[in-house]
Amino acid sequence: MLICIINPNTTKNMTERIETVANKVASNGTTIVATNPKNGPESIEGYYDEVFCIPGILEEVFSNKEADAYIIGCFDDTGLDAVRTVTNKPVLGIGDSSYHIASCLAGTFSVITTLDVSIPILKNNLLKRGFD
């Protein structure tokens, strides 16, 4: 199985670390490839940055069509819904996945962020997925 993790920002160092760690925990027979857009913000800090990330994220999906699944490597799930519209393969967001796992483990859960600008995105993501 080949899983492509897309880091929506352009920080190559972060992308390399994601790939290294993911391959260390991957099951036998699973290969992880991490990639990031060539152009866009170095950091995603709100809806403004998200707008500039999505074209590059989609480009990475089209460049990695051999992947069996995609993971959006950003807790804001930047571009998650857009990627799901261009492929029939599984697409997971690390934020979305975390919410679902947390809801299975506890009756209630909290999301903690270090950036005030992320709060509206995270709230919206939770509401879209049926969490309030």
Predicted regions and their residues:
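Glycine/small-residue-rich loop that forms an oxyanion/phosphate-binding "nest" at active or ligand-binding sites
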Residues: I54-G107, V111
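N-terminal glycine-rich anion-binding loop in soluble enzyme alpha/beta folds
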Residues: M1-P55, T114-D132
